[in-house]
């Protein structure tokens, strides 16, 4: 699954266009490397997202094309 779609489906970022912009700005790292929105995300990957001065680090646990709001938190875990 593409990185921008995973971020939207998991609700780490609300909109896919915002996820694209964050990737273009270099604020998202996958396994420690700057990532484009088109990078394929796999189970076990570590994603770091920089929101201003705050950094969120998560590990991908599951990948689904769609999910309910209550189940979105099961797609990742905070590190």
Label every PLM stretch briefly.
Residues 1-41:
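A basic, amphipathic helix-loop patch mediating RNA/tRNA/ribosome contacts
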Residues 53-79:
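C-terminal structural segments of small proteins and small subunits
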């Amino acid at each position: 699954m593409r990185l921008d779609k995973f971020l939207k489906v998991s609700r780490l970022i609300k909109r896919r266009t915002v996820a694209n912009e964050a990737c273009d700005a270099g604020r998202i790292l996958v396994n420690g490397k700057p990532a484009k929105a088109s990078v394929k995300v796999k189970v076990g990957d570590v994603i770091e997202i920089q929101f201003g001065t705050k950094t969120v680090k998560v590990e991908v646990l599951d990948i689904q094309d769609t999910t309910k709001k209550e189940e979105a938190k099961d797609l990742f875990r905070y590190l």
